[in-house]
Amino acid sequence: MKSDQSKDTQVAFMARIDKITVEETIPLRHSVLWPTKPPSHVCLPEDATGTHYGAFLPLRETPVAVISLFLEDLPLLRDGHDTEINLKSENSNSTIISGDEDSYRPAQQRTVRFRKFACEPEFQGKGIGTQLLVHVLSRARIELDAATVWCDARVTACGWYIKRGLVPFGPTFYKGPEEYVRMRIDF
């Protein structure tokens, strides 16, 4: 029997990853991330300056997963002191100690943020989201010269991101009823 971790990262489908228009991201962003809100809720003011990607399966014209990249600095902690985060998710019962604010944004290094990462529920757990994330992390590092990539992640997904090399930083916070934590990966 396979462990939960190998099941979670098992690749069941090989997706084709392509750059797409922001308009192609909206239906999936809306249906997966905020289905009870109007579609305009998933549109970002910076969408015009972002780079958007979709994961496609054979014989499908629409993406089954989407993600958007933006050049954006890491946020600094308000107080500049070490912060302890207690995260309890299905895959993690860990306490993470964050460094001081200088560890969040190294001087003169480019940071990239990914936002609005969504995968159709029927394709979650099949490796498509992992393929898409690995692809955009590579693109951020190679094409955008990113030293760090970060995101705001729902706390319920924190374990998934940790398995893929991201680490939480800063305190948790809310967007509406959803609890979030910032996560990052350094290259």
Regions found by a protein language model. Name each.
Residues A140-R154:
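Conserved GNAT acetyl-CoA-binding A-motif
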